[in-house]
């Protein structure tokens, strides 16, 4: 982009400028320097003259208003005629290239007094886009002092091309202030300020481009005059030749035009081809493919194989992008054989530029009904013929600049003989917008995406094509769900760094046999209104979800315990974070006021990670550690009043499915559980994924008469507590037995009639050691 610069002399302290020049003039002894110094001091009535916009680094759009100040420092009284400022845009094409590092030719000024005008071609590769002029000061005498003149001007509301400056031309927007004095020598004094303008291109309005379909048909070789036929195994992977039968052969009309001796791999339905394969680009895969087969059969000497057609379909999912975006591309191939190529697909983003030194538009303004006058490309000869020349110079030039490139593998499934490739290419961050709105298309810049597919899979065999794979940029690849699967390109730095030298030239590859190429035009814009709307909606929905989740985390609905959970098969409730194999009861959601005295019942640890809840209020480190420990433990089963017992004593008993003896959970070596009235007590176990009420054969459904106390914390939890916070052992379980008798969850208790059968997860006595957890 073009930076804003000021062409006038800027001086903050005018006195220091004069004192710094006086020693230099005293050191010079030449007569010429003395005259030059005297002439210079005569014109030093105005020392500083510059334009200062309020926002000098801003990029403007058509219709925007630009405000600023014209500063004028007068050291001697001076008379002026007027002081004006003009805002204008100009397009200029240079005749020769400007080497890098050299100053381009001056755009020049059209001079004051032209007023407000529109686009106009001035000839010789110069055209104006618009002009607007405002008078800041009239005729008068300016005394010593610093003068600041405020101005406010606006760009035209119609579309304008973006600012750009390159080696063959420029599109510039400038603020030019001109001071006119009533003298004959140097009557005007002017200064300029370059303004950066961007064309307002909204990419949300561009529809996705139509997919391009390439059909590759095998065509048999034409028989020679001597009647010799080629062997069937010749070029078997690429051609399919059929010998005509003796009884019914295909005759060819004699009035057909002669074939060209030069082989060609591009042919259409109306031309002949000597190559073994030909392809045509169609828009409708169904109708055009069939018509292409019929045309190929009618124009060939021998019938072609209809089932040997190779179809490649390329899709660019977006027609407009912004600088720095990623453009997704989808390629679908229906092949006749299995092909594996690590670099079978080459995608290149390039910029095509076109400049015209003599556009075919009339010179001057034709608003008054004047006859249009066109510029001659070349001087007229004596015969009166114009536009004839024997030289090699051209009025227009077209050039291409490759910006980024990515490779994708081509692997055809041997079962279905199809390949679906999803890849992408990144737009460089410093790419300027598409430019097409200059008068007469004097300067045009368009962007294209070229997709080259090697259908034979032999692109990697010649080393002259791909000598340096590690220097070629690799774009982002997308999985089937649309997510990026290439971790090396997450920052996108490898894409924009590979410019020019490290990009493979595909001109020679496109000429190879079995290689097809399609081109899509994409528009690089400056804004996307649809993306802004979606981001605003997403932010509003996120804020609403946060407001909805805040009261839910602190309170529990009364019907929460009545929901039925079946492990991972149950979906998460709206507004809750998804948890795996976990259901929180009311006691788990309401965190205790004193975390040191835990009142929760801990169950055997089950694998799976749970998201850590965010603390609702500031807490000390010990409380935060205990809360983190509680998130690692499984939850209590919900209390279902329909499935559980009706008595209050039975409601205090935890329930769990009884697992058989041969289950792998017996390897955990739980200690025998306590017996109540000769029956084995039960401890909470893993919840079944099929049903909460799992009945084992041979068990009884009679409930226990007395409730058992809650199970103690397992050894793993105690070790974690000792290592992390050196906490003491939990309180006496017998003291909490009577207080917590009615607060436990309720569910039917199942036990085995046989006294010898042990249940998994039984509660241990207070004086016994806790069961040891072993993997």
Curated annotation (Swiss-Prot):
Query: Which residue windows does the record flag with biased composition (Basic and acidic residues)?
Result: 710-723, 733-743
Q: Which GO terms describe its molecular function?
A: protein-macromolecule adaptor activity; ubiquitin protein ligase binding
Question: Where do Polar residues bias regions lie?
Answer: 279-304, 697-709
**Cellular component terms, GO, for this chain's entry?**
cytoplasm; cytosol; plasma membrane
Q: Biological process (GO) annotations?
A: cellular response to pH; penicillin biosynthetic process; positive regulation of penicillin biosynthetic process; regulation of secondary metabolite biosynthetic process; ubiquitin-dependent endocytosis
Q: Where is the composition biased (Low complexity)?
A: 262-278
The record's region (Disordered) falls at 217-304, 531-550, 586-623, 631-650, 697-775
Q: What Pfam families does UniProt report for this protein, alphabetically?
A: Arrestin_C (PF02752), Arrestin_N (PF00339)
Q: Which family does it belong to?
A: Belongs to the arrestin family. PalF/RIM8 subfamily.
Q: What does this protein do?
A: Required for the proteolytic cleavage of the transcription factor pacC in response to alkaline ambient pH.
Identify the PANTHER family for this entry: ARRESTIN DOMAIN CONTAINING PROTEIN, PH-RESPONSE REGULATOR PROTEIN PALF_RIM8
Question: What name does the UniProt record give this protein?
Answer: pH-response regulator protein palF/RIM8
Query: Which gene is the coding source of this polypeptide chain?
Result: palF
């Amino acid at each position: 982009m073009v930076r804003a610069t000021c062409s006038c002399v800027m001086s903050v302290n005018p006195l220091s400028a004069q004192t710094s020049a006086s020693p230099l003039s005293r050191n010079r002894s030449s007569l010429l320097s003395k005259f030059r110094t005297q002439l210079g001091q005569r014109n030093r009535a105005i020392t500083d003259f510059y334009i200062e916009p309020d926002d000098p680094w801003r990029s403007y759009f058509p219709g925007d208003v630009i405000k600023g100040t014209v500063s004028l420092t007068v050291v001697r009284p001076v008379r002026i005629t007027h002081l004006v400022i003009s805002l204008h845009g100009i397009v200029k094409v240079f005749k020769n290239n400007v080497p890098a590092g050299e100053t381009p030719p001056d755009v020049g000024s059209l001079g004051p007094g032209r007023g407000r005008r529109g686009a106009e071609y001035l000839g010789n590769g110069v055209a104006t886009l618009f002009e607007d002029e405002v008078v800041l000061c009239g005729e008068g005498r300016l005394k010593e002092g610093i003068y600041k003149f405020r101005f406010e001007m606006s760009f035209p509301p119609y579309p304008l091309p973006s600012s750009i400056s390159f080696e063959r031309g420029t599109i510039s927007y400038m603020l030019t202030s001109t001071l006119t004095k009533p003298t004959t020598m140097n009557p005007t004094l002017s200064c300029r300020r370059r303004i950066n303008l961007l064309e307002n291109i909204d990419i949300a309005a561009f529809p996705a481009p139509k997919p391009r379909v390439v059909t590759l048909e095998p065509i048999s070789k034409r028989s020679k005059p001597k009647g010799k036929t080629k062997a069937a195994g010749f070029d078997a992977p690429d051609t399919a030749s059929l010998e005509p039968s003796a009884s019914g052969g295909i005759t060819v009309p004699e009035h057909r035009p002669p074939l060209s001796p030069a082989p060609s791999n591009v042919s259409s339905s109306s031309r002949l081809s000597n190559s073994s394969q030909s392809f045509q680009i169609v828009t409708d895969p169904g109708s055009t493919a069939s018509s292409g087969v019929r045309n190929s059969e009618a124009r060939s000497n021998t019938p072609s194989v209809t089932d040997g057609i190779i179809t490649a379909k390329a899709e660019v999912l977006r027609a407009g992008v912004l600088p720095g975006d990623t453009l997704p591309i989808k390629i679908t191939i229906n092949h006749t054989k299995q092909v594996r190529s690590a670099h079978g697909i080459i995608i290149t983003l390039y910029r095509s530029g076109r400049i015209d030194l003599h556009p075919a538009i009339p010179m001057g303004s034709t608003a008054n009904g004047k006859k249009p006058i066109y510029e001659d490309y070349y001087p007229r000869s004596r015969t009166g013929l114009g536009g004839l020349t024997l030289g090699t110079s051209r009025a227009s030039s077209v050039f291409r600049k490759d910006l980024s490139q990515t490779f994708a593998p081509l692997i055809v499934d041997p079962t279905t003989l199809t390949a679906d490739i999803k890849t992408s290419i990144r737009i460089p961050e410093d790419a300027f917008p598409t430019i097409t709105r200059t008068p007469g298309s004097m300067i045009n810049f368009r962007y294209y995406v070229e997709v080259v597919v090697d259908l034979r899979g032999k692109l990697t065999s010649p080393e002259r094509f791909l000598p340096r794979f590690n220097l070629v940029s690799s774009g982002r690849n997308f999985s089937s769900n649309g997510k990026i699967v290439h971790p090396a390109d997450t920052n996108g730095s490898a894409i924009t760094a590979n410019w020019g030298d490290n990009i493979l030239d595909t001109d020679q590859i496109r000429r190879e046999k079995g290689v097809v190429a399609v081109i899509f035009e994409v528009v690089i814009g400056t804004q996307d209104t649809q993306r802004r709307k979606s981001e605003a909606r997403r932010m509003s929905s996120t804020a609403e979800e946060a407001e909805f989740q805040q009261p839910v985390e602190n309170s529990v609905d009364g019907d929460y315990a009545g929901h039925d959970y079946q492990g991972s098969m149950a979906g998460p409730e709206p507004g809750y974070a998804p948890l795996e194999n976990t259901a929180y009861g009311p006691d788990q959601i309401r965190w205790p006021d004193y975390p040191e005295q835990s009142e929760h019942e801990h169950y055997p640890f089950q694998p799976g990670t749970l998201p850590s809840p965010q603390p609702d209020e500031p807490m000390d480190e010990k409380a935060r550690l205990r809360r983190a420990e509680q998130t690692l433990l499984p939850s209590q089963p919900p209390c279902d009043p329909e499935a559980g017992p009706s008595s209050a004593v039975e409601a205090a008993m935890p329930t769990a499915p009884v697992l058989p003896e041969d289950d792998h959970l017996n390897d955990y070596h739980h200690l025998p559980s306590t017996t109540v009235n000769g029956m084995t007590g039960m401890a909470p176990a893993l919840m079944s994924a099929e049903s909460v009420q799992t009945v084992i054969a041979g068990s009884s459904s009679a409930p226990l008469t007395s409730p058992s106390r809650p199970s103690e914390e397992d050894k793993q939890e105690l070790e974690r507590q000792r290592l992390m916070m050196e906490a003491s052992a939990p309180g006496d379980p017998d003291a909490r037995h009577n207080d917590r008798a009615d607060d436990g969850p309720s569910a039917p208790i199942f036990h085995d009639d046989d006294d010898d059968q042990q249940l998994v997860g039984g509660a241990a006595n207070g004086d016994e050691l806790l069961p040891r957890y072993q993997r």
